Amino acid sequence: MQLPTVVRRAAAWKRFHYNRGRQLSGLNVHDIEEESMKQFSMRFLLTLTIVACAWQLAHADATRRLVLVAGKPSHPPRMHEFNAGVQLLAKCLKSVPQVKTEFVLNGWPADEKIFDDADAVVFYMDGGPNHELVKENGRRLKLAESWATRGVGIGCMHYGVEVVADEAGAELKRWIGGHYEHMFSCNPIWEPTFAEFPKNPITRGVKPFQIKDEWYFNIRFVGDLPGNKAAAEGDLKFQPILVAAPSDAVRNGPYVYPPGPYAHIQAAKGRPEAMMWGVERADGGRGFGFTGGHFHDNWANDEFRKVVLNALVWLAKAEVPENGVQSKLTQAELDANLDPKPAK
């Protein structure tokens, strides 16, 4: 039985194109497929190379520069160990590859180029009228203002939180959200318990802890905020980090200097106080204040150390690890780089 003519012609047409496809320009289909695979492999490898280079460039650009400025030696041994402290913190931050940490010892750097392209600058030093920021008739304050204007993070730790209100109070409130003010704030040595933390990158992985230090409180915050609750004040987003309520005995003194007590400190009994806080500024920069750090040996406390390390990473706009910055210290590392001081 013969197929209809139209069916036979269709079958012949199909066989012609099938055979044509198997032998184009003298190549069989296997040759074509092999050549196509070679081209695909080359293109794929080229694409992978481009992607890898782009990732490396992006990763390099993501590295943040943090500068820690330590003050000159002061106080008895193992107190106000600013030089040893910044070197210890820099060592611990080596576990965070996105942050390149540099430090300055013994006060203001002789070469200010270290501040060029810094993403964050932190001052751990004596403050008040001798604060390194207020010297040179305001020139350094203007320099720091230029950093803030371009979004550089600024942090102050322990005595570095204190400035004379008329000299630099407005600047510190603008940059970090507040400052220690003589005769308004107080500086007792006491042992608060930090039991609860806000949800914030600075508190990642931090567990409740209790530690004795010269914890300043009743800070002069921007807009006269009490400082114990998150708030928006002007161009700042304010977030307390370490908060605890001093006992009446702590409020009654003595404080380190002047010994007090101050009536307004006693009148605020029962009120929780912020001893560490962070701010986000409208210029895109961040700031933080930390009033602990008097006793050098406190850096051996994992939680105390972690909350500060987290804050340094956050200040530089790097990503704080999910469980916080991990670090370990040996006694030898804690004892390293201490200032030569006469025993008292």
Kindly label every feature range from the protein language model.
Residues 61-64, 70, 85-91, 95, ...:
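Extracellular ligand-binding/catalytic regions of CAZymes and related secreted enzymes
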Residues 66-70, 115-166, 290:
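Short alpha-beta junction capping motif
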Residues 73-87:
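Glycine- and acidic-residue-enriched helix-capping/strand-helix junction motifs
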Residues 97-110:
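A short, well-structured beta->alpha microelement
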Residues 156-256, 324-344:
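An acidic, glycine-rich "communication" segment
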